[in-house]
Amino acid sequence: MKNLYPAMPAQAIMMVRMVFFLQRHLEDRLAQVLEAHALSHSAWSLMLMIHSDPAQSISPSAASEALRQSRPHMTRIADELVARGWVERGHGVQDRRAVELRLTAAGKRALGRILPVMWAGYEKLVAGFSPEDATRLCGMLRSWLLELEQADDPLASTPREAGHD
C-alpha cells in the first residue's frame, strides 16, 4: 500500500487500527466476565457511574452522554436494571421534576460481589506489562485522549495534498 500512496502515514494508521482492535478484544473479554452475571457492558458502566457519583445518582441523559450511548438505549439499560431490583428511579434533589437513577441496596450488594471479579479480569488483561511499562502506557494513552477531547475537530487540521480536494 505504501508504494501506491507514498504520502500515506502508515504508522498513524497502524496505531489507530491497533487501538480499535484492542478495544474490541478488551470489550469481548470483559463481556465474557459480565455475561456470567447477566450484565452488558453498558449496564455495568451505568452501575459504576451511579456508584462513583458523589450524590450516588445520575440523570439518564447525563449517563447517555457520558457513556456515548443513545437515550433510548440508556432507557432500556435502566429498565433492565430496575427490573432486576438493582437500580431505582427517583426525583432529583435539585429539581423534583428531573429523574435520577440510584443503586438500590441489592444493586450495591451486586456491585460488591462483581467488582472483585472485574478487577481480576482487568489484571489478567494487562498481566503482560511490567509496572513501568503500564505506567508509561497509561501516561501516553491519557495524553492522547486529552488531546482528542480538547480538539474541536481533530481531522479539520489534516494537511491536504495540492489538487486533491
Spans of features found by a protein language model:
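Pre-recognition alpha-helix immediately N-terminal to the DNA-recognition helix
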Residues: M18, S45-M49, R109, R136
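Charged, amphipathic alpha-helical coiled-coil/dimerization segments
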Residues: D79-G139
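N-terminal leader segment of winged-helix/HTH proteins
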Residues: M1-H37
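Short, locally clustered residues in the helix-turn-helix/winged-helix DNA-binding domain
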Residues: F20, L48-A55, L115
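A short alpha-helical element within helix-turn-helix/winged-helix DNA-binding domains
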Residues: A62-S64
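C-terminal regulatory/oligomerization modules of transcriptional regulators
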Residues: M1-A7, E132-D165
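Key DNA-contact positions within bacterial/archaeal DNA-binding proteins
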Residues: S42-W44, P72
